[in-house]
Amino acid sequence: SVDRARLVRALGAAARKAGRELTCLVQVDLDTPADPARGGVPPGQVREIAEAIEAEQNLILGGVMAIAPLGADPARAFAPLRPCSLAVRAVNPAAAIISAGMSGDLEAAIGNGATHVRIGTALLGARRPLVR
């Protein structure tokens, strides 16, 4: 997932150098107000990042992704994703991925249009954090 034009350019350069294509999702910040410790672009800037990805050789615009804010109502938090997805699809109609929701909030994510969910904890159980 990508939330800054600088990352789009760097990923595009690396993909060209490797002779590969890379599918990128626009990471949407659902925190209100925005939490600087968490990634993502505000919903109003999604199209700008989508256009940057679409313009970059070797990058494929795939759609959007988001994680619900900590402690927020997931159904309410995920509500902006469908309009964000429409903004991305205005840039590239094939960019239909909405990646949102994890084991604890997948129903709310699917209810708001998620096409991909991350359910590692539901499948594998709780795991200890990776400490380096």
Residue ranges of predicted features:
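Active-site loop ensemble at the mouth of alpha/beta enzyme cores that anchors a bound cofactor
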Residues: H116, P129-R132
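Conserved alpha/beta-domain cores
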Residues: S1-G104, I110-N112, T121-A126
